[in-house]
């Protein structure tokens, strides 16, 4: 229950989605609809429309940071997080290209950056497809592999970030036209900020968990933890050393909870060891070996099944399946309450 509370999954503190993102540090945003729901279940009274508006206004941003995948981040954090992550991200991108037997030279990246800057300058926002068409016109490689790298590199170098959605499609804008430049912390300050953000919102968690979530080396992660050690308490459980942040709520009144957890949610994906909340024998029903994560049913903080949502214009249908094949008969009221919350969120 402590982790549920830290993650804002029970008794959420915030009514504004931008405050949730700032609290969490970063929220994985692989699948846009599921990622918005991840914000919604952590924000009191939030709706899908409110979250879309926050994205459109630039109050939260979607970009590749930390690990080389999509995350929602706060405008106040995006620059220092990118600076902390950039070298590792570039190394990961180079490895991906090498795996395809391809390379991108620095000159190609610089040329792509200039073209992207020119086409977005003046407050414009464009989709990936629109940028791809213009890159192709300039004579650069424009297939999916190259465009992914060009755009990810431009994000990494703090050239671009998310713009207002075009319908439900992600767009890009120049970061400098979306977020005012601001002083950057030193590396030690950035490490401590990232450690504080993680442990206050994900505790109890281990150093290995923090390494996994942040993409930092063990040395960097340990330094970040050491800098804020006065804010942390150590708890040993099952031969693992967990860290609790001073802000962690120990006295939690809630005894029971039932949550439809989105795919790729921080409650599962943000930890290297997931056995605390997911029985190992059920791993294959929660995620695949190549990193696809499924929506889960959480009962009292433990994953007990899967759920699938079907949206129509008038209703939301939810199909559930439980890992132990015996659908609990006493959960109909809990399921219906969670379904009504989904309806309220989708407005």
Feature names for model-found ranges:
Residues 1-126, 133-137, 141, 280:
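Phosphate-backbone binding and catalysis cores of DNA-processing enzymes
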Residues 54, 127-136, 154, 207-211, ...:
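A short acidic, leucine-rich amphipathic alpha-helix
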Residues 58-65, 69-70, 155-165, 229-237, ...:
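A short, conserved structural fragment
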Residues 107-124, 187-203, 225:
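Positively charged, polyanion-binding regions of nucleic-acid-associated proteins
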Residues 144-222:
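Loop-centered beta-sheet repeat module
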Residues 203-252:
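Anionic-ligand-binding alpha/beta catalytic cores of soluble enzymes and soluble regulatory domains
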Residues 231-281:
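Non-catalytic regulatory appendages
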Residues 280, 286-347:
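Glycine-rich, small/acidic residue-mixed loop/short-helix segments
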